[in-house]
Amino acid sequence: MKFLDQAKVYIRSGNGGAGAISFRREKFIEFGGPDGGDGGRGGDVWALVVDGLNTLIDYRYQQHFRAKTGGHGKGRNMTGQKGDDIILKVPVGTQIFEEDNTTLICDLTEVGQRYRLAKGGNGGFGNLHFTTSTNRAPRRANPGLSGEERTLWLRLKLIADAGIIGLPNAGKSTFLASVTAAKPKVADYPFTTLYPHLGVARIDAREFVLADIPGLIEGAHEGVGIGDRFLGHVERCRVLFHLISAQEEDVVKAYQIVRNELKAYGNNLNDKTEIIALSQIDTLTIEERKAKQEFLQKVTGKSVMMFSAVSREGLENLLRAGAHIIEMARKKDVVREEQD
């Protein structure tokens, strides 16, 4: 399935149905009086979070959505039928914005959650409503009110416990494929990953969702390369696996490029908990990898792990470190919810 994380849609709720002009007609009753019913309310436009979706690709092919008009009122004081609603099915993690693409309307984070984006117009009054002491047989009814019309942006921010970040060819896709059932494209050239991949990692009876974020390069936050488009997916992650290829000549520079991009992007990405790991260590001697690890630790002041997705050396320890941080974050969320 193709990946699309942003889409523009045009929606319109249904117009209300018109009220009826009708008079009671029964045998032996000469002046039955008005009995025109009200029009039905127009259909609403809803956004609904459904399971099994992880892309907005459907909205590339259909952008216009219009709910049905309410039914017209009828005689015998019968109200018109409500117009059918339109439901926009979206993945977990979808945010909906106004036409300016900056004003947030709603953030949909749970399956089954729904939000009314446009309310249908009210139905018009039938002539029964216009009876007065001086006009017992009004020939007047209201048309229904118009529905709402809006232009909206849908933006998907994948919900993953952990994000995998790093420069192109840092081994992110290989890491994801080695610890989950995901099958991202893996090749020896930059930007192999053109959109995020999700997978579920399991370690010691614990599991968490991993997202492989396409490679960042210097200037990504300004639109260079493809990384800036997907930095938003990092926002929801509890921890970041920051991978640096052990084959890099300057591992510190490789680390700092990505850190600078996170900081420049904003939205507190730079404050995310990270696990730094040298990848592809199977390509170096023990002395070479150790030297790069110690140098990186000295400059950053942080612990640096090492692993190889090919030989699986250090892989389980890396997963355990991530699972522990995620577990602690989940417990904090539970406590926070109980306090609220």
Curated annotation (Swiss-Prot):
Molecular function terms, GO-annotated: GTP binding; GTPase activity; magnesium ion binding
Residues at which GTP binds: 166-173, 191-195, 212-215, 279-282, 308-310
Compartments, record wording: Cytoplasm
UniProt keyword annotations, A-Z: Cytoplasm, GTP-binding, Hydrolase, Magnesium, Metal-binding, Nucleotide-binding
Organism encoding this protein: Bartonella henselae (strain ATCC 49882 / DSM 28221 / CCUG 30454 / Houston 1) (Rochalimaea henselae)
One Pfam family recorded for the sequence: MMR_HSR1
InterPro entries: G_OBG (IPR031167), GTP-bd (IPR006073), GTP-bd_Obg/CgtA (IPR014100), GTP1-OBG_CS (IPR006074), GTP1_OBG_dom (IPR006169), GTP1_OBG_dom_sf (IPR036726), OBG_GTPase (IPR045086), P-loop_NTPase (IPR027417)
Lineage: Bacteria, Pseudomonadati, Pseudomonadota, Alphaproteobacteria, Hyphomicrobiales
Record-given protein name: GTPase Obg
Keyword set includes RNA-binding: no
Entry EC no(s): 3.6.5.-
List of residues binding Mg(2+): 173, 193
Cofactor: Mg(2+)
Subunit-structure text: Monomer.
Residue ranges annotated for the Obg domain, each copy included: 1-159
Record-stated family: Belongs to the TRAFAC class OBG-HflX-like GTPase superfamily. OBG GTPase family.
NCBIfam families named among the record's database cross-references: Obg_CgtA (TIGR02729), PRK12297.1 (NF008955), PRK12299.1 (NF008956)
Listed PANTHER family: DEVELOPMENTALLY REGULATED GTP-BINDING PROTEIN-RELATED, MITOCHONDRIAL RIBOSOME-ASSOCIATED GTPASE 2
SUPFAM superfamilies for the chain: Obg GTP-binding protein N-terminal domain, P-loop containing nucleoside triphosphate hydrolases
Role description: An essential GTPase which binds GTP, GDP and possibly (p)ppGpp with moderate affinity, with high nucleotide exchange rates and a fairly low GTP hydrolysis rate. Plays a role in control of the cell cycle, stress response, ribosome biogenesis and in those bacteria that undergo differentiation, in morphogenesis control.
GO cellular component: cytoplasm
Database matches in HAMAP family: GTPase_Obg
Record CDD domains: Obg (cd01898)
OBG-type G domain location: 160-327
UniProt record, GO biological process: ribosome biogenesis
